[in-house]
Amino acid sequence: IDDKTHGYRAEENGENIGECIFSLGGIYAEILSVKTRGGDRLVAEGLVRSALNFAANRSAYMARADVGRVEKEPFVTLGFEEKNGFYESDIPSALTGSCGHCVK
């Protein structure tokens, strides 16, 4: 989108079924929006994972998303914690997998 804002789109049979917009700044990545057709949790998780991987490959270590701008899922599934109005996590922990994160 520009040099600090990026996005991923998920398509199925040529139809847009989801998108994730995120920005990078130093060691931080901020997920600005995640939208999916019908609130598909798996597509949302895949898009966020893609964004986090992209960010990590560009030296980002921490990620966050504004609680007021995104749905709770997939952030809780990926192990993000809610702090001061944001879902926050270090990227390596979020990318370790959703197994076990959703049950604490």
Predicted segments — roles?
Residues 39-56:
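Conserved acetyl-CoA-binding loop-helix of GNAT-fold acetyltransferases
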Residues 68-85:
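Conserved active-site alpha-helix within GNAT-family acetyltransferase domains
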Residues 81-99:
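Conserved catalytic-core motifs of GNAT/GCN5-like acyltransferases
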Residues 12, 33-34, 67:
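Residue-level recognition of conserved beta-strand positions in structured domain cores
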Residues 25-39, 89:
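Conserved acetyl-CoA binding element of GNAT-fold acetyltransferases
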Residues 4-18:
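Conserved beta-hairpin
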Residues 55-68:
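Conserved GNAT acetyl-CoA-binding A-motif
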